Amino acid sequence: MQDRPTSVELLEAAADFVDRELVPTIEGARQFQARVVANVMRIVAREIKLEDPLARSEVKALARLLEHDAPHLHSLDDLRVAAARMGEELTAKIRAGDADGGSWRGEVLAVVRQSVEDKLRIANPRYLENDIAVRGAEKARKEI
């Protein structure tokens, strides 16, 4: 266990420095590249914070969907491997038409949607927030 600042805090501080101190002082392609660097640091920070719990949730959901016993995995690497294998199995079932109809289709859509949302929580949470806001507005319009 490391003392503070944590790796996440260091990445967030570095990203803030790039945005506040460097980006305003440069122009053109270099400014764009600096913004990309800050964004990458924030993505890595979110991944460090969120990847383990999100991977555990994904493995559990895929195991339930595919009717496997939920594996008791401890390392993040093992979770990644299990998620990839079950993801490939689900992909094969979808390609075979197993999710074209019936109640399982709804379950598949729910699991896939959650997986995409979890990936967006790391890669681009603002997109996810905007999507949720748009869906909420559409739902409200339908209720009127």
Regions found by a protein language model. Name each.
Residues 3, 7:
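Short alpha-helical segments enriched in small residues
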Residues 8-9, 14, 30, 59-144:
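C-terminal amphipathic alpha-helical interaction region
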Residues 15-52:
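N-terminal interaction modules that seed assembly of large macromolecular complexes
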Residues 47-64:
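Short, charged early-sequence alpha-helical segments and their helix-coil boundaries
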